[in-house]
Each structure stands twice: as C-alpha cells, then as structure tokens.
C-alpha cells in the first residue's frame, strides 16, 4: 500500500486531485493537506489572500510546514500541487531530510510570469515536474514535461453553439473575494433584469461550502439567486458568466461560455503585485490565447475575453462587457484554445506516479 504525502492547498488543486485519485489504484493511501479523509489539515485552513493576510497567519503556516516535513517520513513519495510559497520550501526541506524521497510537482508555479529563479529550485528538489501549460516546459532544463491539462479530463459538458438559458455568477472561493465581488455582481444582475427582463440567475458556490451557512458568507442578497455546486454544468447552460479571476475563467473558455473576468485586490497587494509581475492579462484563457497566437503569454495584443481589474472594475463595466462582447468570435476562438491544450493530464500523472514508486 503506497503512502503519498499530498500538499494541495488550493480549491482547484483539490478538484484536480479528486480526478487523479479516480485513476489511481484504490490501495494508494493519502496523507497531508487535501480535501478528504485522513488529512492533516483541510485546504480551507490555508485560505488566505494578500501579503498582510499571510503575515497574520505566519505562525500557523510555519507549524503546518514543520508537521508536513515530519509526516513525509511516513510517505513513499510526495505530491505537491500549486501553492509555490508553501510547497517549494517544503520540497527543499523534505529533500534535505531524505535525499532519496521522490517528489513530484504537479500544477507548476507560474515562473513565466514572475520569480523565474523558482524553476531552478524546482529542478533541484523535485524528481518530476508535471506542466499543464504547453509553453511553460521551455522555462525548465530537463525535468518538466507537458502532461496535458486536467480540465480536459474533468469537463464533461462542451457547448455546440453559443446559446444559453441562464446568467452565471462566480464571485470566487475565498471569503475576501466574495466580499468584494458579490455586491457588484448583485447590482449587475438587478440592472440586467430591469433592462432585459427576468433571466434565471445562478450563483455557483464552491463544493467545499456545502453544509456551511451560505447567508452568513454571501449576505441577504443570496436569495436572489439559484444555488449550484456544479460549476461545469452551470457554465454549460449559461448564456453568459461573470467570474472572479481563477481557474473558473479557463473552465468557461473551454466549455465555450462567454464571460467577463472581474477582480479587485487590496490596494497594497495590487501595487506590490504590479511591481513583481509584468503581465497585461491575469486570466488563464487570455494568457493561453496569447501563446496560441505566438505572442508572449500574458503580454500579447490578442484577447479572448474582457478583463476588468482593480479600478477598471465597476457595475457599468460588467454591463458593458455583457452587452458588447462578440459572442460568435469568442465561441470560435474558444474551440481553438481547447485544441491547443490537446488532452487531459490525469492518466499521464498517474503513470508517472507509478514510475516514481517503482511500480512499473
């Protein structure tokens, strides 16, 4: 019975992990940080955003880090997913503790956007790097392979045309995101009803919010929406979506649902990020679309969907994006994006895990 130490702190990473587990033998035992049984911590306990938020929880993060290093002694291999600020130092300490411990990094840090030096650290401390973006392999010397994209395994619904019956609202998976995005989405929904008549409004809620008091999280205005825990099905049925930045934007693009990306960070966090990251776009679909058109990812002129960031974000901007988007062009180009990513990644990662465990 192989034991795998997992560090999956993000909601999206846990969706990918769940799909991966369906493709692994049932006798694989998971320990560490993930959503599920036998976890040391739930990813919800790491749900912080912004530099000040991290500083406020530094004691907990250091404690969890130390416990994960100790837990690695029980594992046959280590699987790290995303969350580079936590996982790269973790890889370093585990490798120092046991140089023979096999470490896989799946869902790589965005070294193409900032901190390119992290690529050297990853190759030094990890044994296999599973890249889910075709262009990011070029930032590594030898250990990175493009394995496909996990969303192409997970998405079961793809639009055949641009039609839809609902408006979908996805204000994020973190409390800080919801607090900023949801009030704007509510106002946009109300104005759209005044201008165009009633349309079904669907609020997509993260699956790990099940059992929680949603009214306490979203406020009284949640009553204006139908609630869905199935993002893919809801996007498939939608005419248009209003989405907080994140994996959901790429999901919408692959499914073929027109959308606008909306995001607003704390002013200090935004200014620090602007100094560290040189990108025109923050949406994965736009970044991939640049690469697809042979442009520098995140810095190209081509755009698949509108982005409303920081002071450019307003209710008026959301409404304008809804009204003016060229839906037919968007749908045609979203099909090209799906072809660019080529295939899913889950089986490839499962095979590589078996190889690292000497099971093949």
From Swiss-Prot:
Top-level EC class as recorded in UniProt: transferase
Pathway: Bacterial outer membrane biogenesis; LPS lipid A biosynthesis
Catalytic activity reported: a lipid X + a UDP-2-N,3-O-bis[(3R)-3-hydroxyacyl]-alpha-D-glucosamine = a lipid A disaccharide + UDP + H(+)
EC numbers, comma separated: 2.4.1.182
Disulphide-bridged cysteine pairs: none
InterPro entries named in the record: Glyco_trans_19 (IPR003835)
GO cellular component: membrane
GO molecular function, one term: lipid-A-disaccharide synthase activity
UniProt entry keywords in alphabetical sequence: Glycosyltransferase, Lipid A biosynthesis, Lipid biosynthesis, Lipid metabolism, Transferase
Biological process per Gene Ontology, one example term: lipid A biosynthetic process
Signal peptide: none
UniProt family annotation: Belongs to the LpxB family.
Function of the protein: Condensation of UDP-2,3-diacylglucosamine and 2,3-diacylglucosamine-1-phosphate to form lipid A disaccharide, a precursor of lipid A, a phosphorylated glycolipid that anchors the lipopolysaccharide to the outer membrane of the cell.
Protein name, as recorded: Lipid-A-disaccharide synthase
Organism, as annotated: Helicobacter pylori (strain P12)
